[in-house]
């Protein structure tokens, strides 16, 4: 028993030894390992390598073999690297317990949350990379404890707040990347303390304020990225102290002032990008000192002056991009000494003179981009002989001369865009034989001869634009077989013959051959060009039928085959063109009925079938075309009645033309539902009944019902139409004019007044009833007369004399009134300087340089209304704004009043634009833009800063007065409200023809939107210098419809627009692309202001903002690249 007890003790001892050994092996994982396991708890997702290695192992006392871990000699964690490991979760505060950590790389994962402040405890950290994650909130200010930190990457996160000042006091910091966050506030002054900093990237944040001058103390800086922030102020001169600087990007900020950069200290500078700022002055000549400079990029920096010749000293320069500035003068020939130059971009400036032949010496030059300047003369032959050029972009200049045969030897040439110049002569026949051309754009020159056959010899041609020249002959078959062409424009030439067959699987997407002499059938092979989105073959001599193969073009959005000699019926297969938005086959000889399956065109906005031989009644499916806004099917043989379902096309806004179709019956009642319709033509039919249905068409600007069999009175809402276009109602012998219409209507119309039925009816009253009525009427009149006499006697004592002006405290003194009356000889006719809707204007010169304009208002109201007017005028007199005419004084009497204004020496905007000698006051675009902005400011003030708001109701050039500096001042504001005391709307129209908003055409609805419409018309006058209703316009066309029509016919092409609608005086000025872009933006604003629907118009505050933005136009482009 005793032995058994001893054996048990021995076994128990062994068990205890085994158990203790096991426990020791579990707890022997060192503290760094345990810290890592704690960090693991904060992670939502880790790669398999982590789950398989990050765990307790009896045979390992350290985590040195774990995935992503590297240890130092003491078996402490020195590096944690999870880069690109698809880890998600948060970085726990336990990270601060890794005291030996030297490298922490968690880049390119999905970490979120804040950066733990405990990182400041990792005092041995040399590299901290948390880039490309989702960290948010502020950068902890404890990082300044990392005295050994050399590299800090925090870019591409969601960090916010200001930078800690202490960040730049980390003594050994060499690399700091903070780009692509949402950091705000100023750049700390402490940046100058970062003596060891070599690379600093802070771009694509929200930093504001000035770049600190102290940055010049960061003497080790080589790379500095500050672009795409909100920095202001000037470029600090202290940057010139950074002798080690190789790369400087400060583009896409709002920096101002002169560029003072380029000291002898910049020898190491390789790349300089100052683009998209608002600098003053020119390109600093001192940049010629930066002898190592490889890329100089200052795009849209608001630079002016000339290009310094000192840039020719930069022998290593490969990229020179000074585009989109206001540089003037000529290109210095010294640039020909930049022997390494690869890219020269000087486009979108105001450069003049010839292109220097010295540029032909640049043997490495690949891209020469001089477009949108004012260059003249010929392109030097040395450039045509270049064997390095791949791109030659010189469009929109005044260049001339022939295209030399040497052009055909440019073996690397890919892109040649010469459009909108004055090149003449033939295109060299061999062009394309020796090079792989990709883009050839010669539109808008004076080129003659035939299309060269080898343009697509290299089978890479994507764009071939030869429109608006004098070319003749046929299209070479090789061009039709060129599958790579995407955009093909030959419009407005003298080309003839048949169109070539197009290859299968052609890349063609845009085809415009309009206005030539092409003949024969339209090739069915066009239907194989599946990418086609636009076809314009109008104004040619094509014959035969429309090929049904065109129905294969499911991406086609625009088809114009108008004004040809096409015949036959419309192929039903076209219904498969389900993307079609505009379809025009007008002015052909097509016949038959319109296929019902065209109802598939759900996106169609414009349908033009006019001047053909279509029959079978107006198509019943039209209401299914919900987006249809223009329907022109005039002068066909549709016959039948107008289907009532047309009234269901709610978006029918612009035009409904059913004229000349032999239509019968009455106008269907549903047509009255087209309340947005602006143009209606149902003339030359056999329609009967009354026009009462048209009462509801309140948006109509033009209507023609002539040559039908209508009867009865013309609706009240068409009174204005009858006055302006009486012929639109002629040929209806039984139509008549209501007695409520103005007498002037009858003077211009052959129609008679409607019979007054009340006069022809017998009263049916007996003799004694008539006597009784007469007696009672006499008694009533007597009572009224006695009452009026009594009232007059009561008021006589306190009433002013009839011709005496009434004064209040706020009104001008009687002495000034006497001077005004004396200066105008009691308002003598000879002092008249204008007549307006509200009265006559006189010029009163009171000596000592004081000249006033005196407006005499005539009232029809009684004296109480005048007292109300005094309060109203008093309110107007307190309105103060630089773009509003200031009321200097006013006087009232019973029947009229005088209002005194400062005299404007330049007269009105109408005088300046349309006066007898407008050339004496020609406004350049800058002046016109300032007028547009000034008027917008004035109207915005009236609409939103006056209480109550003032709606002008008669904005037009005559009411915009110009001071000696051509600053605009709006006049007559408040007078419409002063002279009309109704509350909501009136039956009479307030405003001037051409400026009246559609909703105000036949009654006045008070709203700011009507002023916005009138303002839009004024903008169009500034752009076009045409009157609102100009004699040059087609009949029944105002400036709004004329501009919309012009833009529509040009497919919104910028060049076409400039030549079509813009004032010819501005054309030379608009060679500057930024100004041309301004004109486009202002035109778009005008069209937005003149939309039919008042709710769709911008407010005047919107207009001011857009115009302010236009002032600083800058094309969007990434400044991350120097190109």
From Swiss-Prot:
Q: Which residues lie on this side of the membrane: Extracellular?
A: 29-769
Q: Which residues carry this modification: Phosphotyrosine?
A: 901, 941, 995
List all membrane-crossing ranges.
Answer: 770-790
Under Enzyme Commission nomenclature, its number is: 2.7.11.1
- What is this protein identified as? Leucine-rich repeat receptor-like protein kinase PEPR1
Q: Where are the LRR repeats?
A: 31-53, 74-98, 99-122, 124-145, 146-170, 171-194, 196-218, 219-243, 245-266, 267-290, 292-314, 315-338, 340-362, 363-386, 388-410, 412-434, 435-458, 459-482, 484-505, 506-529, 530-553, 554-577, 579-600, 601-625, 626-650, 652-674, 675-696, 697-721
UniProt modified residues of type Phosphothreonine: 824
């Amino acid at each position: 028993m005793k032995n058994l007890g001893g054996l048990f003790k021995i076994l128990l001892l062994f068990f205890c030894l085994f158990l203790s050994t096991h426990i020791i092996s579990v707890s022997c994982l060192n503290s760094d390992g345990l810290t890592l396991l704690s960090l693991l708890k904060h992670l939502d997702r880790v790669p398999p390598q982590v789950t398989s290695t990050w765990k307790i192992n009896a045979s390992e006392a350290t985590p040195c073999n774990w995935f992503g871990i590297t240890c130092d000699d003491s078996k402490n964690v020195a590096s944690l690297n999870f880069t690109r490991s698809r880890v998600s979760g948060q970085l726990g505060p336990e990270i601060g317990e890794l005291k030996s950590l030297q490298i922490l790389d968690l880049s390119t994962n999905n970490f979120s949350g804040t950066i733990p402040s405990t990182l400041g405890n990792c005092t041995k950290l040399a590299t901290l990379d948390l880039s490309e994650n989702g960290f948010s909130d502020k950068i902890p200010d404890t990082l300044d404890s990392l005295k050994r930190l050399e590299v800090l990457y925090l870019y591409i996160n969601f960090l916010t707040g200001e930078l800690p000042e202490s960040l730049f006091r980390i003594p050994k910091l060499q690399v700091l990347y903070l780009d692509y966050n949402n950091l705000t506030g100023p750049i700390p002054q402490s940046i100058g303390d970062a003596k060891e900093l070599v690379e600093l990237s802070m771009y694509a944040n929200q930093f504001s304020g000035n770049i600190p001058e102290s940055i010049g103390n960061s003497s080790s800086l080589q790379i500095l990225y500050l672009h795409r922030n909100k920095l202001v102020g000037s470029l600090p001169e202290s940057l010139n102290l950074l002798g080690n600087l190789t790369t400087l990007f400060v583009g896409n900020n709002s920096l101002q002032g002169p560029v003072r950069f380029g000291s002898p200290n910049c020898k190491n500078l390789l790349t300089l990008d100052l683009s998209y700022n608002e600098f003053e002055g020119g390109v600093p000549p001192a940049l010629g000192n930066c002898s190592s400079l490889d890329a100089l990029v200052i795009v849209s920096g608001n630079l002016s002056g000339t290009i310094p010749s000192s840039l020719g000293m930069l022998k290593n320069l490969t990229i020179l991009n000074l585009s989109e500035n206001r540089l003037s003068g000529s290109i210095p020939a010294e640039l020909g000494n930049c022997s390494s130059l690869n890219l020269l971009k000087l486009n979108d400036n105001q450069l003049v003179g010839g292109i220097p032949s010295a540029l032909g010496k640049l043997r490495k030059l690949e891209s020469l981009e001089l477009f949108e300047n004012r260059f003249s003369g010929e392109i030097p032959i040395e450039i045509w002989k270049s064997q390095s050029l791949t791109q030659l972009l010189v469009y929109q200049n005044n260049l001339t001369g022939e295209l030399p045969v040497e052009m055909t030897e440019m073996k690397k040439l890919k892109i040649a865009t010469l459009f909108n110049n004055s090149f003449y002569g033939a295109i060299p026949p061999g062009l394309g034989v020796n090079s792989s051309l990709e883009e050839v754009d010669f539109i808008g020159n004076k080129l003659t001869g035939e299309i060269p056959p080898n343009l697509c010899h290299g089978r890479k041609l994507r764009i071939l634009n030869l429109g608006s020249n004098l070319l003749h002959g046929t299209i070479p078959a090789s061009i039709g077989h060129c599958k790579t062409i995407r955009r093909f424009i030959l419009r407005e030439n003298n080309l003839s013959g048949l169109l070539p067959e197009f290859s299968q699987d052609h890349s063609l997407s845009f085809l415009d051959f309009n206005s030539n002499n092409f003949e024969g059938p339209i090739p069915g092979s066009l239907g194989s060009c599946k990418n086609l989105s636009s076809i314009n073959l109008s104004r040619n001599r094509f014959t035969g039928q429309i090929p049904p193969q065109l129905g294969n073009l499911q991406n086609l959005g625009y088809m114009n085959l108008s004004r040809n000699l096409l015949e036959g019926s419309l192929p039903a297969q076209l219904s498969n063109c389900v993307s079609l938005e505009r379809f025009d086959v007008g002015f052909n000889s097509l016949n038959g009925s319109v296929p019902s399956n065209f109802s598939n065109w759900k996106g169609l906005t414009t349908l033009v079938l006019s001047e053909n031989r279509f029959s079978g009644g107006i198509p019943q499916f039209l209401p299914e075309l919900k987006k249809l806004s223009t329907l022109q099917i005039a002068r066909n043989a549709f016959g039948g009645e107008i289907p009532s379902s047309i009234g269901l096309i709610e978006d029918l806004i612009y035009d409904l033309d059913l004229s000349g179709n032999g239509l019968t019956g009455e106008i269907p009642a549903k047509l009255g539902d087209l309340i947005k319709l602006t143009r209606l033509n149902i003339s030359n039919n056999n329609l009967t009944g009354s026009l009462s249905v048209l009462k509801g068409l309140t948006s109509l600007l033009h209507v023609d019902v002539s040559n039908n069999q209508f009867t009865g009175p013309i609706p009240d809402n068409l009174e204005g139409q009858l006055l302006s276009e009486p012929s639109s109602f002629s040929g209806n012998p039984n139509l008549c004019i209501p007695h409520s219409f103005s007498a002037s209507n009858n003077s211009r119309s052959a129609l008679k007044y409607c019979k007054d039925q009340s006069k022809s009816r017998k009263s049916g009253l007996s003799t004694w009833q008539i006597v009784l009525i007469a007696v009672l009427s006499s008694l009533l009149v007597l009572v009224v007369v006695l009452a009026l006499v009594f009232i007059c006697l009561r008021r006589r004592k306190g009433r002013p004399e009839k011709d005496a002006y009434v004064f209040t405290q706020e009104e001008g003194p009687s002495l000034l009134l006497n001077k005004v009356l004396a200066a105008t000889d009691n308002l003598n006719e000879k002092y008249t300087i204008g007549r307006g809707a509200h009265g006559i204007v006189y010029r009163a010169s009171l000596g000592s340089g004081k000249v006033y304009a005196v407006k005499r208002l005539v009232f029809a109201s009684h004296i109480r209304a005048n007292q109300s007017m005094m309060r109203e005028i008093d309110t107007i007199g307190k309105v103060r704004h630089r773009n509003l005419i200031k009321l200097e004084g006013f006087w009232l009497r019973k029947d009229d009043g005088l209002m005194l204004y400062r005299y404007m020496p330049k007269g009105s905007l109408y005088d300046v634009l349309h006066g007898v000698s407008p050339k004496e006051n020609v406004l350049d675009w800058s002046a016109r833009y300032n007028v547009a902005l000034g008027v917008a400011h004035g109207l915005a003030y009236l609409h939103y800063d006056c209480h109550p708001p003032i709606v002008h109701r008669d904005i037009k050039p005559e009411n915009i007065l110009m001071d000696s500096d051509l600053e605009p001042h709006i006049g007559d504001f408040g007078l419409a409200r002063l002279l009309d005391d109704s509350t909501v709307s009136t039956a009479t129209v307030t405003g001037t023809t051409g400026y009246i908003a559609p909703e105000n055409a036949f009654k006045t609805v008070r709203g700011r939107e009507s002023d916005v419409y009138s303002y839009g018309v004024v903008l169009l006058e500034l752009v076009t210098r045409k009157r609102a209703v100009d004699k040059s316009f087609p009949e029944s066309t105002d400036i709004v419809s004329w501009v919309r029509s012009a833009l529509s016919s040009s497919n919104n092409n910028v060049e076409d627009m400039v030549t079509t609608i813009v004032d010819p005086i501005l054309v030379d000025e608009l060679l500057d692309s930024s100004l041309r872009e301004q004109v486009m933006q202002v035109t778009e604003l005008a069209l937005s202001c003149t939309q039919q629907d008042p709710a769709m118009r911008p407010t005047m505050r919107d207009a001011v903002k857009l115009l302010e933005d236009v002032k600083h136009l800058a094309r969007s482009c990434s400044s991350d690249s120097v190109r």
